[in-house]
Regions:
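Extracellular/oxidizing-compartment recognition motifs
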Residues: 23-309
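Bacterial Sec-dependent signal peptides at the C-terminal "C-region" and cleavage site
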Residues: 14-26
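Sec-dependent N-terminal signal peptides
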Residues: 6-15
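N-terminal secretory signal peptides that target proteins for export/translocation
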Residues: 1-2
Length: 309
């Protein structure tokens, strides 16, 4: 055998091993140490990388919904990721090319997780982070023992609707330079039970925002305001507020929102959808309909995503 062929075989073996390590079926599951039925969870980890990798990919599996961030940039792209059947908790993995978000030095990977419906889940996310160095050699960046987590400001109600907390209480949860004193080590699921994972890597069905529109008209009914969109929609609701009181409670359809008290703020669903034509907004004793600056319906649609585009 020639030296060239020998080196080629060795290179192929190295590539195979690196890809095997990054195989989503071999990823280790993790969860908040004390999972409950309704909590959304933030996960984060920091990686020290001497040189910016030539390529970098993250394969993330989840039994619920997630948003993936690298250095504060949302790399997920779609909404309600991954697309799944209602009230399902099967494990689904998606692979993302995160090369353009990488840098030399500290790289922070963060995940916002939500259960797909109210239920306790011992396996929440699993993640594999890998790529290639400047010399072409494979790199696996995983360090499961360093993952931290804490409950997010949002959660689900027992009926499966979204409860939005005050975002200003942790505005930079996915950034590098935050105080992690109140964060806990993620619980690594150590059993050997095989969990089937549906892996979506090239072309798959996903959900995106297809149209944004405002109401046709609104009516003031007592202490509430009803916004009529003319025709029913399925998607997210986004409400822009001004001069709300910090801690003020609002009901926006089935969604609950606690105001941050900033001059301008937005309440928007993240992991649930609304299906309606008329949207009722009300609040506590501090609520004033003049606080509502804009109400928008962000209609969603299912499409085929091509990760090679």
């Amino acid at each position: 055998m020639s030296v060239g062929k020998y080196l080629t075989i060795i290179a192929l073996i190295v590539i195979y091993i690196s890809e095997t390590k990054a195989n989503p079926y071999q990823m280790q599951w993790m969860a908040y140490p004390h999972p409950d039925d309704t909590a959304q969870v933030w996960f984060r980890n920091s990686y020290e990388i001497a040189e910016r990798p030539v390529t970098a990919r993250i394969t993330i599996a989840s039994t619920g919904y997630f948003e993936l961030y690298v250095n504060e940039r949302n790399v997920t792209g779609d909404v309600l990721t991954p697309l799944r059947e209602r009230c399902s908790a099967n494990a689904i993995a998606v692979t993302y090319d995160v090369t353009r978000f990488m840098r030399a030095g500290t790289n922070t990977v963060a995940v916002w997780y939500s259960p797909s419906f109210p239920h306790p889940e011992s396996r929440q996310i699993a993640l594999s982070f890998y790529g290639r160095a400047g010399d072409g050699s494979p790199e696996v960046f995983d360090n499961n023992s360093s993952w931290l987590c804490r409950k997010a400001v949002n959660s689900l109600s027992t009926e499966g609707h979204e409860l939005l907390g005050m975002a200003e209480t942790e505005p930079k949860w996915n950034a590098e330079d935050i105080d992690v004193a109140r964060w806990l080590p993620a619980r690594i699921v150590g059993d050997n039970e095989c969990v089937p994972i549906e892996h979506r890597s090239r072309m798959y069905e996903a959900t995106r925002i297809s149209r944004i529109r405002q109401q046709k008209y609104f009516d003031i009914e007592g202490d509430s305001v009803v916004y009529d969109f003319g025709e029913a929609f399925v998607g997210l609701v986004r409400v822009t507020l001004r001069d709300a009181v910090k801690g003020q409670n609002m009901r926006i359809g089935d969604m609950r929102y606690v105001c941050s008290g900033e001059a301008d703020e937005q309440a928007i669903q993240r992991f649930t959808t609304t299906d309606c034509r008329r949207l009722l907004i009300s609040g506590d004793e501090n609520f004033d309909n003049a606080q509502i600056q804009k109400v928008e319906a962000l209609e969603t649609e299912t499409y085929t995503r091509d990760m090679k585009e």
